[in-house]
Amino acid sequence: EVALRAAAFIRQIDRLPLLVKSAPGFLVNAVLGPYMLEAMRVVDEGLSPETVDEAMLAFGMPMGPIALVDIVGLDVAMAAGRGLAGAGVEPPKCLVERFNTGCLGKKSGKGFYDYSTGKPERRVAGIVPAGLAERLIAPLLERTQQLVDAGIVADADLADAGVIFGTGFAPFTGGPLNYVKTRNKD
């Protein structure tokens, strides 16, 4: 009964409720974490934050993963990453270096981007390597499937809707699991 009342309230505030079982990060944060982690690993490998973000904007995401880390806050990303990744997973060097110098993202005026003018100052993105968007979303796709397989989310359609509405995942795809299903048919 409590869940039904909570869902009714969420509808009243014009949001879409999605009942999920309790798990670290539930659905949205559980799938965003691996996606943002992979994006920062790519930055560690030498690609610019602008290039990483451009790849995902071109894919159809509303915002790049590096810009998202800046908005969430590097301190929050660091803490959430530890909680979601588990023991033994090292945080990306680019995150640790910025965090250790007090660059916490938009809230501190500097993170991966400089916000001293109020808006992020970005350099021109480099050439986006072929396959970069696919590499970046692969952990998100995998984690979404794991959550369905574990029964955290009741089924693939609900997971797809939750990830689209909760993260802005490129809506034209029909959601991450639909994207995998239709991509594999080609």
Regions found by a protein language model. Give the residues of each.
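N-terminal glycine-rich phosphate-binding loop for ADP-containing cofactors
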Residues: 1-186
